[in-house]
Every structure is written in C-alpha cells, then in structure tokens.
Amino acid sequence: MSLFSLPSDFRTYCKNKGYYFILGDDAYINAVNDSTVYENNKIIVIADLSFKPNIDNNRPYSVTYSGTIAIGRKRESETDDGITTETVSSLDETFEQKYDNRLQDLSELLMVILSDFACSNDIELNSVNARFDINKFDLNADFVAAQITLTK
C-alpha cells in the first residue's frame, strides 16, 4: 500500500468481501445508485474522502485521510431485471424498528470493516463519529455513516 492508495485499497477490500463500493461525493453516489440494481441484502459501502499529506523536510511521510464512510443495505420488495429484493421494513416503520431491523447490525458491521481494514493495512484509525442516515439518496436506503480520520 502506497501513501496515496488508501481509496483504491479500500475499494479492493470491499469488493473482495462481496460489498458494492462507491467512491465519490453525494451527487455522484446518487447517480450511481439510480443506475444500479442491488441484490437482496447486499451491503453498500460508500466513501467520500479527502487527504492531507504530512510533510517533513519537503517530503510526505504519512497521509491523513478524513471524510465519510457509510454502510447501508437496500431491502425493499421489488423485482427489477429479474432480481427481487425484500425487506422487513415498511413506510410507517418507527426509528426504533429501523434500529432493531437494520441499523444496529449495520453499526456493528461498520466498526468491523473499519477495524479489519485498518489492521490489515497498517493504518491508524484515529477517530470515528457515526450517525444514522435514514432514507438516504433517491435509493431510500438506511445507512450508518461515520466521519472518520485514518492515517497511513
């Protein structure tokens, strides 16, 4: 892993785990989501990162990445191109039901993914500040999103 390869290394990590991975800002992510048919219960990982090289004697010795990493799952009952997705959600679902049905599991998975990726790639996970993003994007999927800081 080079100092500047964290986004591509994270993409490879996610794809090797079988997750959908999207790198970019909200507008780009929304456009990708609009044109993607997600399989039932597949995990969607979103990353929107910026970086700051740490420099000594005019040379970068490490890079600090910050931004958002979000984990979600599209789970509504519909068939598109022969793929049916199903869910335990409904339009009148309370926040507590969303938490019990999806958000708790996604919260735990987010931390597992971040910790595993950091440990496997000699990265320091400096901070994680997570939130619940309900009905995110035109996709209307629920995500657990974290503002993160990582140093390589």
Place the predicted regions along the sequence by residue.
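Small/polar-rich, solvent-exposed N-terminal microdomains that initiate assembly or binding
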Residues: 1-59, 140
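Acidic-leaning, charged glycine-interspersed low-complexity segments
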Residues: 12-13, 22, 40-42, 96-151
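Generic structural motif
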Residues: 49-52, 74, 137, 151
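Short, cysteine-centered beta-strand-loop-beta hairpins and adjacent loop/turn segments enriched
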Residues: 54-57, 72-81
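Oligomerization/assembly interface segments of phage tail-like spikes and tubes
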Residues: 61-76, 141-152
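A solvent-exposed, charged loop/short amphipathic helix patch at secondary-structure junctions
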Residues: 77-100
